[in-house]
Curated annotation (Swiss-Prot):
Residues where Mg(2+) 4 binds: 504, 508
Organism: Emericella variicolor
Cofactor entry: Mg(2+)
Single biological process term from Gene Ontology: alcohol biosynthetic process
Taxonomic lineage: Eukaryota, Fungi, Dikarya, Ascomycota, Pezizomycotina
Stretches the record annotates as Geranylfarnesyl diphosphate synthase: 338-746
Protein name as it appears in the record: Quiannulatene synthase
């Protein structure tokens, strides 16, 4: 912890116009990290081919040049100030990069229209490569944090992952008060992650239970930080709103407390901004009052509690002082921005001289099918999962005949229909004998894909951590697979993955997948199997788009391995057979490892960097094993898995997992009882709760769960060592792969 800090004077705060009741401090080493900021700027703009200026440093009275981190984490340990500054700066760069990309939505409309209807689209795969590079920059800092303090770094990553799973960039619509708005903003603002960052910087460690206890107090301070950001960013958000309206003809109202007050209390813009400032003070006073209440209830609090509170307080007061001076947030006066009002859910300039009618988007949706509109909208907004769209039309000049229900047949030539009768009128025969017309040879009309794709589209739409695509992107930093080939490989993996999930859920009699009904529960077994088969064929068709002659061989070999491994898993379950640990590992190497090998081998085959450095190591084999054993373990102990799949769902389906093998591999009476339960379990409906609890207790008593956990921790160490060996062969680090691994740690 820093031995001392610099207190910002009341005079300086008054000159800046701040209202926080918390003190404003700055780290004594604030000048030392300016060079870190410049290095991040140079690196990001060089890698991303941009010229972004985050404006996170400013010239402060009596201080000179300083960065926001020095104000928001003034008690940061001196040896951690640099990494906290770099992480904060990279976060600002990423925010600005994606914010600027949002302005380009109008271009994306045109590109996606051409893409959907066969035209030449802008190469988004190159953009995706740039995004991967930006993630690599951030990942390198996060990995460095793990080496400094793995416990606090992991706390931050868990918070980050939790927020990503539940957060969407929602709209103000439906929020009827500030009380509804503030929890919504806490969820998607990232302030909880910054609280963990501050704790990392200060070295403050609290248990999960302690954090939950202090949450109501800390949230009040976080609310004030959110409102501070809303107040200072408002003019910038208004400018962005009108820029987007000018470009596309529409825009969502800013997600900002100023809007909330204007809509719910009917206040003017100026009055609403003043209400925001008043609420900043109210939230901070509430925070301090709750601390005092806690002290009165419990007596003197642990020092770490006070530091935890200060982390939230200085984030608020420091960010306000910084925001009041930095040029990142221009004022309405500096923007020469008139007052705005809300009319029919839209922002309008109050001045009548300002043009009210926005320029409409150049490309319209007139004449485009509704299904295509939704695809384009979802792609432009970046919210859709990848859904296959393989449409084909009969060749020009093709002729086909179709029987129709009234006894006529339709001859279709070049898309024009000619109707002919068959000697019957209104169902009455005009002759003595029924004359039957045969369909002549010729092209046929393909059935639409909507029905066969429906189950696939459903499972592809479910929430997912998208581990496989992240793995592919991370490996591509080494392998340099051309963009089109990389896109094909991702589609191949997605088709196979979702196909296997649909079939697995049927084979396992599962009812939940990621907290939602399994596909076959909605579409039935037969239709789901048909969709899974179609996805498999689509994957094979995609392989033909790859350039390497070995691609088909790789695909067939690993898909065969996948099914061989699955056959062992299903056989053991059906016969209640307990394999040896070695047999189990062989099954995993085939069933789970096949997908990882398929990714790597296809990428190496298409790589612009000739090498076999990854598959020659045991890294991929270890990764497949870790992935499966971790899944076995989490299914039994994780509350998240319980929510998504049900309590100990593997026991319901009779799966022979590694913890179960450890439990029943001996000849003890307890092992025999567990075997008997599995042998006589109901095929449909799984096991009663009390039997699952009994089996779980036996796993705990026999040390099966602890043995599995110990093995996983040993494998974690081996995976990092294996990754470092691969990094040595490539001659470069891959922080994205390491970060992906560390996010899986148990």
């Amino acid at each position: 912890m820093a031995s001392e800090v610099i207190v910002i004077s009341d005079h300086a705060r008054k000159e800046a116009g701040t209202v926080s009741v918390f003190p404003v401090l700055i780290h004594t080493d604030y000048a030392r990290v300016i060079e870190d900021v410049r290095k991040v700027e140079d690196q990001f703009n060089s890698e991303m081919k941009t010229s972004i200026d985050t404006k996170t440093t400013a010239d402060f009275p009596e201080l000179g040049l300083a960065h926001v981190t020095a104000f928001t984490i003034p008690y940061c340990r001196p040896d951690r100030l640099s990494i906290m500054t770099r992480l904060t700066e990279i976060t600002f760069f990423n925010d600005d990069y994606y914010d600027d990309a949002g302005v380009e939505k109008i271009l994306d409309y045109n590109n996606h229209l051409r893409e959907c209807f066969g035209g030449r689209a802008e190469d988004e795969l190159t953009k995706a490569s740039a995004v991967t590079k930006s993630k690599q920059l951030q990942a390198s800092v996060l990995v460095e944090m793990h080496y400094i303090d793995s416990e606090l770094a992991r706390d931050m990553m868990l918070t980050y992952n939790r927020i990503l799973e539940v957060t969407s960039l929602g709209k103000n619509a439906g929020l009827k008060s500030l009380d509804e708005y503030l929890p919504f903003r806490i969820g998607n603002s990232g302030i909880e992650v910054y609280q963990d960052m501050s704790c990392f910087g200060m070295g403050v460690k609290l248990t999960k239970e302690e954090k939950e206890k202090l949450d109501p107090i800390v949230i009040a301070a976080h609310n004030s930080t959110t409102l501070i950001n809303d107040y200072h960013s408002w003019p910038k958000e208004v400018r962005k709103y009108f820029n987007e309206v000018q470009a596309t003809g529409k825009a969502d109202l800013p997600v900002n407390a100023v809007c909330i007050f204007m809509q719910t209390e009917g206040l003017s813009e100026q009055a609403s901004r003043q209400r925001v400032r008043e609420e900043i003070i109210a939230q901070q006073k509430s925070h301090l009052a709750m601390i005092q209440d806690l002290v009165e209830q419990e007596g003197p609090l642990p020092e770490k509690y006070y530091m935890y509170f200060k982390a939230a307080q200085y984030t608020a007061s420091g960010s306000e002082y910084w925001a009041a001076i930095t040029s990142r947030y221009p004022t309405k006066t500096e923007l020469n921005q008139p007052e705005v009002i809300i009319v029919d859910g839209e922002l309008k300039y109050e001045s009548s001289e300002i043009q009210q009618t926005p320029k409409q988007i150049a490309t319209t949706f007139n004449g485009i099918p509704e299904s295509a509109k939704s695809i384009i909208e979802s792609k432009v907004n970046g919210t859709s999962a990848h859904i296959p769209d393989i449409r084909h039309s009969p060749a020009d000049g093709a002729q086909t005949h179709h029987l129709i229900s009234d006894g006529q047949f339709r001859e279709v030539i070049n898309g024009h229909a000619n109707v002919h009768t068959n000697g019957k009128a209104n169902g009455t025969s005009q002759g003595e004998d029924l004359e039957v017309y045969e369909v002549t040879t010729g092209n046929f009309q393909r059935a639409p894909e909507d029905t066969v794709l429906a189950p696939y589209q459903y499972i592809a739409s479910l929430p997912s951590k998208n581990i496989r695509n992240k793995f592919i992107d991370a490996l591509n930093l080494w392998l340099g697979v051309p963009p089109l080939a990389l896109s094909s490989i991702k589609r191949i993996v997605e088709y196979l993955h979702h196909s296997s999930l649909m079939l697995d859920d049927i084979e396992d009699n599962s009812t939940l997948r990621r907290g939602k009904p399994c596909t076959h529960m909605l579409y039935g077994n037969a239709q789901t199997i048909n969709a899974a088969n179609y996805a498999f064929v689509s994957a094979f068709a995609e392989v033909q788009n790859l350039q390497s002659p070995s691609a088909i061989t790789i695909f067939i070999r690993e898909v065969q391995n996948m099914h061989r491994g699955q056959s062992l898993d299903l056989s053991w379950k059906y016969h209640t057979h307990c394999p040896t640990v070695d047999e189990y590992m062989m099954m995993v190497d085939n069933k789970t490892g096949a997908m990882f090998r398929l990714c790597v081998q296809l990428m190496q085959a298409e790589s612009s960097v000739p090498c076999q450095k990854i598959t020659q190591s045991d890294f991929i084999t270890q990764l497949g094993r870790y992935f499966q054993i971790r899944d076995d373990y989490q299914n039994l102990v994780s509350s998240e898995y319980t929510t998504q799949k049900g309590f100990c769902e593997d026991l319901d389906e009779g799966k022979i997992s590694l913890p179960l093998i450890y439990t029943i591999m001996d000849s003890s009476p307890e092992a025999s009882v567990v075997k008997g339960i599995f042998h006589h379990r109901l095929r449909e409906g799984g096991l009663p709760l009390h039997l699952k609890e009994y089996i779980l207790s036996q796993m705990e008593e026999k040390g099966a769960l602890s043995a599995t956990h110990s093995l996983l921790q040993k494998m974690q160490k081996e995976l990092i060592e294996g990754l470092h060996r691969v990094e040595e062969t490539f001659g470069s680090k891959n922080a994205l792969v390491e970060l992906m691994l560390r996010r899986l740690w148990v």
